Amino acid sequence: MCIRDSGNTVTSDSVIRSELLLDEGDPYSKLKLSKSISELKARNIFKKVQEKIVDGSKNDLKILEITVEEKPTGEIAAGAGVGTEGTSFSFTVQENNYLGKGLMVDATLSASEESLRGGLTMSNPNFNYTGNLVYGGITSTNNDKLKSSGYENTITNLNIGTKFEQYEGIFFSPGFDLSFDDLRVDGTASDKLKKQAGEFTEFNFNYSLQMDKRDRAFMPTSGSVASFTQGLPIYADQPSLYNRLTYSKYHGFSDDVIGAVKFYAATITALDEDVRLSKRITLPSKRLRGFERGKVGPKDGEDYIGGNFLTLSLIHISEPTRQAEISYA
């Protein structure tokens, strides 16, 4: 099989070919072609992706022609609002195809009357043309709640990792993260917060195992995907063990209606004393919509402090043609 691509004036050819499960000289496979086109669409850097099979110069030779239509991949967003934490501001710069090499860059800054958060992440889905994902980032968060809850903490986190397909449909994702946590309290803080005051450093090794049996990565209609994640302390002033399990099962009821059952569970266990406030589990906002970020779970006074255990079951129904989604938790 011969492969030709066109329409990519900004995007490098290597970005397109890195997502293909078919290589030059391979026999034609309709299943691999369908999955390849799905992977290209999932990159979210093309407005349209079209494929065409034409006969070659010989009877047993096929030519795969892939035509793409590029779209703006950069996004700048700014917002302001008034809520339970008072006035808040946010600013985000995101690029999904940096330098036309498929690099993803995300910079965020958000501020409210009691918190300030900033972060920069970057990932390369095809590092050194190996097909392996490599990512890294840094985030810093400052919560100044001396007036309302008697504490102030600053958390800085650095992470780096990779993800690759070890076997067909089996992905392995090892990584490291380094965090610094400084918690200061005054006399009005709760006893639980006073016990956790101080400066703490933690260096962890994290890994994930994922089994992906979906028919395609972009808007799957059948199959399932399951993953297990664990965080192991290499060095920690107050160590803890983190575990997470996720599972999603998809089923297409018709061409227009796709259903999914999703399960999410996570635990964190202290290996010395109590789990630190900054390490407790909170429900990711993308898992349960309709709630403010970090505003679900146990509370200490007026503060949401997270917990040591979390479970979530979700029934999700989507209509891709209408771009409509319904979720039941």
Regions found by a protein language model. Name each.
Residues A42, E75, T188-G198, E202-L314, ...:
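C-terminal outer-membrane beta-barrel translocator/porin domains of Gram-negative envelope proteins
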Residues R4-G86, T92, D106-N124, L245-T246, ...:
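Periplasmic polypeptide-binding modules associated with outer-membrane biogenesis and secretion
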Residues K58, G81-S88, A107-G118, D144-N153, ...:
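Solvent-exposed loop/turn segments connecting transmembrane beta-strands
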Residues M1-I3, H316-E319, Q323-A329:
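Single conserved hydrophobic/aromatic residue that forms the stacking wall/gate
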Residues Y98-M104, F127-L133, S148, Q166-F172, ...:
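Short loop/turn motifs that connect adjacent beta-strands in outer-membrane beta-barrel proteins
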